[in-house]
Amino acid sequence: MKQEKYGVLMVNLGTPDAPTPQAVRRYLAEFLSDRRVVDTPRLLWWPLLRGIILPIRSPRVAKLYQSVWMEGGSPLLVISRRQHQALAARMPDTPVELGMSYGSPSLRSALDKLLAQGVTQLVVLPMYPQYSCSTTAAVWDGLAAQLRDNRQLPAIRFIRDYAEHPAYIAALKHRVEQSFAEHGEPDRLVISYHGIPVRYANEGDDYPQRCRATTEALIAALGLPEGKIMMTFQSRFGREPWLTPYTDETMQGLPAQGIKHIQIMCPGFAADCLETLEEIQEQNREIFLHAGGEAFHYIPALNDDPLHIDLLEQLVGKVE
């Protein structure tokens, strides 16, 4: 009987190779060319992307990356590597590789390493707690594209999401309790998720429901009154309506309601990145304090916390 060989592929979004306009432009060109991310007809989108968006946004975004860049690369890459190393250490007899949907390390390189080790049973773990067509489904598309020319395919177990997994909720709860112990209980705990266009949800993407499921499970775990926690959406892009309420507009309005002390977390991000460290911890903090807020504390992502690695290990299962 054929001996099966298991392997694990961890996948996150990706990152530029450097905080420079040129590197950011290459990354954004790949990212924003994915139809799962932007589904505007190509004849309209290509001139807009290459003629306006990339020339204007690349230098701006490069400056933002410069403000959070770490010695080993972008925060997302550095932390993803730590997560990869920690999970691999838990599973010494199972190949574990990290790939990115856009940029390096690529899905192709990660798959090549796994297949070269004779993997016949592949567990694919997109590092997105809440399913969305623009993230999780893009991993599926990328995986299929990379395997299209292979004569021999591994059996694949694809983890769609883990929005309500008990170990995920327990890890989030622990993060919140740590923050409350350090900074006191806030007037509001804000749960900010990356947004998507409303149209995507209307067309069947159940991302809003998955975000709500996480929020409701966390409310129950913390035992806080529902009015103590609010859910918002960040990082909107383009002109069409995105999921609301918007995080930045919420930050602007809360102090006028007498809410002067907030703590904010972004449970949709498995690793801290530009959207959490710069957009939330810097931009939204400034908005809140300028509007009259008095205390703003960002609760870090789960990153390589041991409780997070416990979760990842449970998700991929015992595959030795």
UniProtKB/Swiss-Prot annotation:
Reaction equations catalysed: heme b + 2 H(+) = protoporphyrin IX + Fe(2+)
Q: Which residues form a coiled coil?
A: none
Enzyme class comes to: lyase
- Biological process annotations from GO: heme biosynthetic process
Name a Pfam family for this protein: Ferrochelatase
Q: Where in the cell is the protein located?
A: Cytoplasm
Q: What is its EC number?
A: 4.98.1.1
Which residues hold Fe cation? 194, 275
Q: Name a GO CC annotation attached to this entry.
A: cytoplasm
Pathway recorded for this protein? Porphyrin-containing compound metabolism; protoheme biosynthesis; protoheme from protoporphyrin-IX: step 1/1
What's in the keyword line of the UniProt record?
Cytoplasm, Heme biosynthesis, Iron, Lyase, Metal-binding, Porphyrin biosynthesis
PROSITE patterns on file:
FERROCHELATASE (PS00534)
Q: From the UniProt record, which GO molecular function terms apply?
A: ferrochelatase activity; metal ion binding
User: What is the role of this chain?
Assistant: Catalyzes the ferrous insertion into protoporphyrin IX.
What PANTHER family does this protein map onto?
Answer: FERROCHELATASE, FERROCHELATASE, MITOCHONDRIAL
Q: Which NCBIfam families match?
A: hemH
The family this protein is said to belong to? Belongs to the ferrochelatase family.
Record-given protein name:
Ferrochelatase
Q: Which organism is it from?
A: Pectobacterium atrosepticum (strain SCRI 1043 / ATCC BAA-672)
